[in-house]
């Protein structure tokens, strides 16, 4: 079964048609807003986007993969580059906590993490996403290495995992109202541990 014909939009097979992909993501955002995570389904997205389920599954192998793309599209976070690692990481976490707290993205991401505990497709989608995030946060560490702030032998990905674990714990325990001072203290402890002697 192919995509239902929609004027001005056509399927181009396995390669994503940008117009169709946007329509599907917009439909997914709308279904998520109306039905929440528990009421979200590929069937509902397909109906709303007037697209075939096979098209959606060809482009996103699981519900979780589509939801992660929706999450990424909604995520509008500045990545600080102040010239000081402690400021960059603290600013990143403050912005992330506010984004999770003040938008539906926090609930979506929390639900994805929970689903990944029992669903292999969700776990795989989350692992792929985390790999990209690890590299993104790791780039802040690498910049600090270049500036001589951080010891050359520090593994940037491990430090990124430490920062992510702090953030995820607050997300999963619904403690996103953490005081900025506490966030800065946690970051200071991490940075002291990797600082160049």
Regions found by a protein language model. Give the residues of each.
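Basic, helix-initiating cap at the start of DNA-binding domains
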Residues: 1-39, 43-48, 54, 65
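Helix-loop "lid/cap" segments that line or gate small-molecule binding pockets
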Residues: 94-101, 109-118, 187-193
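C-terminal peripheral helix-coil segments that are non-catalytic and often amphipathic
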Residues: 1-9, 91, 95, 135, ...
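Amphipathic alpha-helical packing segments from all-alpha helical-bundle domains
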Residues: 107, 120-146, 181
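Hydrophobic alpha-helical connector segments
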Residues: 77-109, 159
């Amino acid at each position: 079964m192919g995509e239902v014909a929609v004027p001005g939009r056509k399927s181009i097979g396995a390669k994503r048609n940008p117009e169709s992909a946007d329509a599907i993501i917009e439909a997914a955002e709308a279904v998520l807003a109306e039905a929440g995570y528990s009421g979200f389904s590929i069937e509902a997205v397909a109906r709303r986007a007037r697209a075939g389920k096979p098209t959606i599954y060809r482009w996103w192998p699981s519900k979780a993969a589509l939801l992660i793309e929706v999450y990424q599209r909604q995520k509008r976070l500045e990545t600080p580059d102040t010239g000081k690692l402690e400021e960059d990481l603290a600013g990143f976490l403050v912005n992330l906590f506010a984004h999770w707290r003040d938008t539906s993205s926090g609930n979506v991401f929390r639900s994805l993490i929970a689903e990944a505990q029992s669903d292999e497709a969700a776990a795989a989608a989350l692992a792929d996403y985390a790999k990209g995030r690890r590299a993104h946060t790791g780039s802040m560490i690498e910049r600090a290495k270049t500036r001589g702030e951080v010891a050359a032998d520090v593994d940037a990905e491990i430090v990124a995992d430490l920062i992510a674990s702090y953030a995820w714990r607050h997300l999963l325990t619904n403690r996103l109202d953490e005081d900025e001072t506490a966030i800065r203290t946690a970051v200071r402890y991490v940075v002291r541990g990797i600082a160049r002697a």
